[in-house]
Design a protein with these regions (language model features):
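Active-site entrance/lid segments in N-terminal catalytic domains of soluble metabolic enzymes
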Residues: 1-124
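Acidic, glycine-rich active-site loops and adjacent beta-strand->loop/helix elements
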Residues: 29, 101, 133-134, 156
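Conserved active-site-proximal phosphate/metal-binding subdomains
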Residues: 107-129, 135-241
């Protein structure tokens, strides 16, 4: 819903119409065939009076001066202690520590939250919340027992009445078990946890056949630009998600 500065501005306006409470914006810095206009997005965030930004993917260091000068609190999502410490060193105010259980990109270290969260608690001097596999009150109690200040839910919020995604997607998430995810793009050092479907099966067959020779172009049909078709149209087999 926020691929361009104009779309983000529209979403901010909607949020302000619905609540007078604080809300944040996510900025994800990932490899892309057509990278978003990050400076433009940040300009809209600042002009919109947003005071909390969650960054993810690559380091937010390049954009920290603009965000901090605007009085914005930055929470960076990290999948390792070393990345968390780096985020702390560049001025992030808090960390979202993302365990291997998470949907999406879990990093390359494969460390689950039962190990990762206590390590973060031992090393970090700034607050952190737990991410990855968080879904209910049990998750929150466990996260806080392991040293987190709270938790961050992602996939869980897709399966809500308010989420602007197709009902097929919501049902697939609710009906999935712990055995229904797959890890893809490991050989490209861009690991992603996705829900199993025929498109993912095709992708994994390509990975198996090509091995170390696999390139992004070999799997582009399964991963590039598929989200609108899946999330909005409900075509569950359009690609990996």
């Amino acid at each position: 819903t926020q691929g361009t500065p104009e779309k983000l501005a529209n979403e901010l306006a909607k949020c302000k119409d619905m609540t007078d409470k604080p809300f944040g914006v996510n900025l994800t810095f990932l490899p892309s065939l057509t990278p978003p206009d990050y400076p433009g997005l940040i300009k809209v965030i600042i002009e919109g009076g947003v005071k909390i930004v969650e960054t993810a993917g690559r380091s937010p260091a390049e954009y920290m001066p603009a965000l901090k000068d605007a009085g914005i609190k930055v929470i960076h999502k990290c999948t390792s202690v070393r990345h968390s410490l780096k985020a702390q060193s560049v001025g992030c105010d808090a960390i979202s520590v993302d365990g291997f259980e998470c949907g999406g990109h879990p990093g390359e270290d494969d460390i689950p939250n039962f190990i990762l969260l206590p390590r973060a608690a031992d090393e970090l001097e700034i607050p952190f919340v737990a991410s990855g596999g968080m879904a209910d009150a049990r998750s929150l109690v466990a996260a806080m027992a392991l040293g987190a200040e709270g938790m961050n839910m992602g996939t869980r919020f897709i399966a809500t009445e308010e989420a602007p995604v197709h009902e097929n997607v919501k049902k697939a998430i609710v009906n999935a078990s712990e055995l229904d995810t797959r890890l893809i793009m490991r050989s490209l050092t861009n690991t992603e946890r996705v829900l199993a479907n025929p498109a993912v099966d095709r992708l994994m067959e390509k990975e198996k056949a090509l091995g170390d020779k696999l390139t992004f172009s070999d799997i582009v049909d399964e991963v590039a630009g598929v989200y609108p078709t899946i999330m909005m149209d409900g075509d569950m087999d359009a690609g990996a998600w």
